Each structure stands twice: as C-alpha cells, then as structure tokens.
Design a protein with these regions (language model features):
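Short, low-complexity interaction segments enriched in Ser/Thr/Pro/Gly
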Residues: 1-4, 18
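Sec-dependent signal peptide recognition
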Residues: 3-11
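Hydrophobic h-region of N-terminal signal peptides that target proteins for export
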Residues: 10-18
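N-terminal, post-signal peptide beta-strand-biased segments of exported outer-membrane/organellar beta-barrel
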Residues: 17-116
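Outer-membrane beta-barrel porins/channels
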Residues: 19-39, 45, 103-382
Length: 382
C-alpha cells in the first residue's frame, strides 16, 4: 500500500512540475509556439474564429464587435518523448482579454498573457568516476532554471474605409528567472546561482481588407521597439553542506562560506537578448453567413546580437520559425430559436518548423485543434 502511495505522489509531482523539451532551448519555450493562444480563436491568429469578422488575437477586427468583451482562457500543455514512456505537462492562465468597441469604427483593448516559460531541470546522466588518494570520487552536473516572461498587451483598431481596417498592438514584456548550476563532488554540492530580470517592448501592426464574395485578406508585421534586456546578477559560489539548494544557515550543517561572509557580484546588463521580427498573411472565405474557411502563414526571425552571451541549458536557440495553419469554423446565431444554431465550432491544423541558430537543425511540429461553444444570448456568456 505504501509503495502505491509513493508512486502516486511521484506521478502527481511529475505532472505538476514537469517541463517541455523546448524549455531548454534559448530563453525558454515561447507560448506562441505551444498551441492555441486562447480558447476562442483556436489556431487562428488573424482570421475569424467564433464571430464573423472578429478574431480576438487581431486588433484590426475588434471594432466589429457589438458589445464589450471580457475573455479568460486557461490552457494545459503536455509533451511526450519518442521511445520513452514519459509525459511532461503543465497548465496555467493563457490569456486574459478586455476589448471595448467604440461606435463600430474604433476599439481599444487590454490583455495579459504568458510569453516565455523558462522552467527546466537537467541532470547529467554520465557521471565521471576517478580514483585519487586511494578513494573513488564521483562528479556529476545539474542545471535548474525557473521563471519566465509575461506580456502586457495594449491594442487599438481604426476602420479606415468600409473595406480597410488597421490595428496596432504594443507588447510590454517583463519577468524574471533564477537558475542554479551545480557540480556534485562525492556527495558535496558546489552551486552557482544567477538571477535575471527582463524587460522589452514589441509592436505589431495589423491590416484587414475586404475583397469580393465574402473573402477577407489579413496581414500583420512585427517589429521590436526595444529589444529585451537582461539584468543579470551572479551570486557567490558556495558549498551546499545541508543539501537544500539555498545559501543559508540551516542546521545541522552550515554552508560554506557563510552567507554574511560574501557579497554578490555587481549586476550587469545584456542589452539585446530577444529581438524578433516577422510577418503574417491570412485569407478567409465566409460561406452561407455562418461557415468560414481560413488559411494563414507566418514567418519570424530572431535578430538578437547578444543572445549567445547567456548560459543556456542546451547551447542552442530558435533562429527562424515558419508556420502554416488551416481552419474551419462555424459561427453561432444567438437570435435563432434552434439550439443547434447557437453552437459554435472551430477546428484547425497547424504545421511549424523551427530552425536552430547554432546547429541549423530543424525541429518540426504537427498539431490539430478542435473546440466548441454555446451562445446563451446576444449579450452574455459563451
């Protein structure tokens, strides 16, 4: 019975505090590469999803809303490894959005969402063994990092003509992380702790254009206004005598040197660790006023000049990302008396390729998404 309880606890811990493989590449795993941005848009980031002519990830469509909208999305992610019976998963708030349309011509919106997940824990499998002074010594290394970046997003739209609409989104990035590099020498841990603070500013410009026969064309352009800066503080090396991972006074053993005997090194700044640029194109076709087919393509590049000066768990980073998406959606009709007409459906397929900057290897991902909703009334919950 006790063994079953222990196995259950270990399973829950691995489910709650696990990691994805891409967390160890570069600054961490970008949530934009993880899956859907929010529960309403599905795989779409430009084309309509649950409402005709509206995508909550595309500010140039916000003025088409009839009422103010508040959206909260919660997501989970699971990563499995080929040839291994391992499944890593984590979950959390994926997006909180508030949009206010103004006279069907303008709109403003505010949202907050996670941007990068930096959680990773690596332990070297190969332990170095050697004999010295008639004693067998073992050396192994480990790397642990936690934290990440959030994005505070402020957007607006303006209907230029009956067929052309413009949108803009400013992404204020901020966050922090902590990492420990440890060398275990025959039961004794020597640890180097580093703390980092991040801030940056990215802008996105959007265009929506109505063509003939219910065909819509979308595009967006991403430009970095202020590259993400890393303020890094390296702590003094210490011997973790009590094996708790912290530089402290906990008994029965005391870490060496004592915490009050040393000071941290001076904080230094790395001014350009994330500098993305990219563009997106999309096209959608409305059928019978309640169905939509859409295709989207995007490409993004990492133009950082200082990214290589940061210690990574894996000595690599994503230099280029290309994605292709196709989706099929059904809009809900809140005025219909038929229950089936009040149900919205969104589904899609996604293909992404990530080119690594150091080795130029390519990681390929294939994904699918399906979701549904129910419209209770014109103004209300869904």
């Amino acid at each position: 019975m006790m063994n079953k309880v222990i196995k259950l606890i270990l399973f829950l811990l691995s489910f709650s505090f696990s990691q994805g493989k891409m967390n160890s590449i570069g600054l961490g795993k970008f949530y934009s590469n993880q899956g859907v941005d929010n529960a309403m848009d599905g795989v779409n980031t430009l084309a309509p999803s649950i409402l005709k002519n509206v995508n909550f990830s595309n500010p140039s469509t916000w003025h088409n809303l009839k009422f103010t909208y508040l959206s909260l999305s919660y997501s989970s992610d699971q990563t499995s490894f080929e040839n291994f019976s391992l499944a890593n998963a984590y979950s959390g708030l994926s997006n909180a959005l508030w949009v206010i349309p103004i006279k069907s011509k303008y709109s403003i919106g505010l949202s907050i969402s996670p941007y990068i997940n930096q959680k990773v824990s690596l332990v070297e499998q190969d332990t170095v063994v050697f004999i010295a002074f008639e004693d067998t010594l073992h050396i192994s290394r480990s790397f642990k990092r936690s934290g990440g970046l959030l994005s505070m997003n402020m957007g607006s739209s303006y209907q230029l003509t009956r067929k052309i609409s413009l949108g803009i989104m400013a992404n204020v990035l901020f966050g922090s992380s902590r990492q420990n590099e440890s060398v275990k020498f025959s039961g004794s841990n020597t640890i180097q702790t580093t703390r980092s603070r991040y801030n940056g500013l990215i802008s996105n410009f959007f265009l929506s254009m109505k063509l003939r026969n219910e065909i819509m064309l979308y595009s967006s352009f991403k430009k970095t206004l202020k590259p993400v800066e890393n303020a890094q503080l390296d702590k003094h090396l210490f011997n973790d005598a009590n094996s708790n991972g912290f530089h402290d006074w906990s008994s029965p053993y005391f870490d060496f040197p004592f915490p009050d005997s040393v000071t941290s090194y001076s904080e230094y700044r790395i001014s350009d660790v994330h500098n993305p640029a990219g563009f997106q194109f999309g096209i959608s076709k409305i059928l019978n006023k309640k169905w939509s087919f859409a295709f989207e393509w995007s490409s993004e590049f990492e133009n950082s000049k200082e990214l290589q000066n940061i210690d990574f768990p894996v000595n690599n980073w994503i230099y280029e990302t290309n994605s292709f998406k196709t989706s099929f959606s059904k809009f809900a009709n809140s005025t219909s008396l038929n229950i089936l007409d009040k149900i919205s459906i969104r589904s899609g397929l996604k293909y992404s390729s990530y080119t690594l900057g150091n080795s130029e290897k390519v990681i390929q991902e294939y994904g699918c998404s399906i979701g549904s909703g129910y419209k209770f009334k014109s103004v209300g919950n869904q």
